[in-house]
Amino acid sequence: MNISDIRAGLRTLVENEETTFKQIALESGLSTGTISSFINDKYNGDNERVSQMLQRWLEKYHAVAELPEPPRFVETQTVKQIWTSMRFASLTESIAVVCGNPGVGKTEAAREYRRTNNNVWMITITPSCASVLECLTELAFELGMNDAPRRKGPLSRALRRRLEGTQGLVIIDEADHLGAEVLEELRLLQESTRTGLVLMGNHRVYSNMTGGNRTVEFARLFSRIAKRTAINKTKKADVKAIADAWQINGENELELLQQIAQKPGALRILNHSLRLAAMTAHGKGERVNEDYLRQAFRELDLDVDISTLLRN
């Protein structure tokens, strides 16, 4: 691909509103000014270097465009179950806990709920932001408070002022990383602002507060949990809904998908298998079938050059 072809390819994408200079800059590592000047043949710098970077961007763009489009979001039975808890917490201004094994769809359900509802804010806790200050800072950024205070006391007060009267919902994903001090801070924030709060994570997020593991530290929080939703495994109805979204309805294929969904990682592994199977089938001009699904599930554990699948 010569420089003229690269310029023409980029110009076509921008003129057809398939992308923007800003998006190309973000994904290529170049500035918007450099890209604009290069496309218009007015760049005075190293055109060879820029053309190589933009050629790599173009190749990746077209490779992604060739991939079969997966369903954007599938509203499964488990999703509805999670949404019910979120609505309850929001409407009753209370605390709900959603816990379950990895890969059952908790995070995607929460993201979609945030996307389709007003005043819903979601943060994901990592070990590096599990302290009171870091957790509250993460929440402040999610709320658009980019100039928020950097000390716990002032930050907590600023968050209370921001959340009061919003009738909103705060979702804390991976809340099992949080200790008693942070959870108590979130409880007080929820109580004072009368917003809903959903703590979401693995079963430890709930077991810390119950049974033999419950301590005095967690007692006040536990007594204020209004609703608990535990998702132990993938439901058959979830797998059927996902298969329908992918237009897969063969009996053998459905049975295999049910088996895959029972593996560790559940729906996450299922969706990876479906995407890889769809890529392989698409590259051969065929529909996804049992053989492609089995091959995809095996290859997820192997060293496979994915880029070759579309060329076969």
From Swiss-Prot:
The record marks R268 as: Sensor-2. It comes from the Viruses. Pfam families: AAA_22 (PF13401), Phage-MuB_C (PF09077). GO terms for molecular function: ATP binding; ATP hydrolysis activity; DNA binding; metal ion binding. It is found in: Host cytoplasm. Keywords: ATP-binding, DNA integration, DNA replication, DNA-binding, Early protein, Host cytoplasm, Hydrolase, Magnesium, Metal-binding, Nucleotide-binding, Transposition, Viral DNA replication. InterPro entries: AAA_22 (IPR049945), B_transposit_C_sf (IPR036733), B_transpositn_C (IPR009084), ExeA_AAA_ATPase_DNA-bind (IPR052026), Lambda_DNA-bd_dom_sf (IPR010982), P-loop_NTPase (IPR027417). One of its GO terms (biological process) is viral DNA genome replication. GO terms for cellular component: host cell cytoplasm. Gene3D superfamilies: B transposition protein, C-terminal domain, lambda repressor-like DNA-binding domains, P-loop containing nucleotide triphosphate hydrolases. Its cofactor is Mg(2+). Its main location: host cell. ATP binds at G100, N101, P102, G103, V104, G105, K106, T107. Belongs to the AAA ATPase family. Selects the target DNA sites for transposition. Recruits DDE-recombinase A to the target sites and catalytically activates it. Displays non-specific DNA-binding properties. Polymerizes as helical filaments around the DNA. Coating of the DNA by the target DNA activator B might play a role in favoring target-primed replication over integration. Prevents self-integration into an integrated copy of the viral genome. The N-terminus region contains a putative DNA-binding region that allows filament-filament interactions and probably favors MuB polymerization and filament clustering. The central region contains the ATPase module. The C-terminus comprises four helices arranged in a loosely packed bundle which can bind to dsDNA. PANTHER family: GENERAL SECRETION PATHWAY PROTEIN A-RELATED, MU-LIKE PROPHAGE FLUMU DNA TRANSPOSITION PROTEIN B. This is ATP-dependent target DNA activator B. The gene is B.
